[in-house]
Amino acid sequence: DSDHWTNIKEIGGGRIVGEAVHGIDLACYFFDSLPQSISASAPVDKTNNMVKDNQVFLNINFANGSHASLQYFSEANQILSKERIEVHGEGNSYILEDFKMLRFLEGSQDRSKTFSSGKGHKESLSIFFDYVRDKSQNPFTWEEIKAVSKAAIIAQDHINSGQQHNV
């Protein structure tokens, strides 16, 4: 849908800045580290030779040596989950589907757990109001917000230039 807010860069910043940025932020949370460099690629629409930035591949290197590979697809089959996160390491794998089902593959065990899920709006507002009322500390630092936002903006720039950029 070309008139959707995420596709109008002047309004929503595009798919990377408007949506894929949340994946960058989540990776920072998982690794407890800020991004140091990012590269991105996207397919080119053969009919108009324009980059399809709603189909994006992001590779991010973090300050602590971790690495994340994020793929954002807005044109996938609707049967698939909208959001899928896979974490692999030390012979174990964890797969999170739509933030509702977590599959644990540890050694020879294959277990899963289901969760109720929302969009996080209620929780975000609660955190914000607790901070405004001096009931809690701000869980976000300016350094984190700046690094995640800068990584998303650089990723969009990278798609257009084809070069890796330091964050």
What annotation goes with each model-predicted range?
Residues 1-49, 162:
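Predominantly a Rossmann-like dinucleotide-binding segment in NAD(P)-dependent oxidoreductases
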Residues 7, 53-57:
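Short, surface-exposed amphipathic charged segments that create phosphate/polyanion-binding patches used
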Residues 13-14, 113-115, 134-138:
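Active-site rim elements
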Residues 18, 82, 140-143:
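Residue-level signal for the nucleotide or nucleotide-sugar donor/cofactor binding architecture
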Residues 23-24, 121-126, 152-153:
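A general structural signal for well-ordered alpha-helical segments in protein cores
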Residues 34-39, 67-68, 93-95, 138-139:
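Acidic/polar loop patches that form or flank catalytic/metal-binding clefts of enzymes
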Residues 47-53, 61-126:
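NAD(P)-dinucleotide binding in Rossmann-like oxidoreductases
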Residues 57, 63, 130-167:
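C-terminal helix-rich "cap/oligomerization" subdomain common to oxidoreductases
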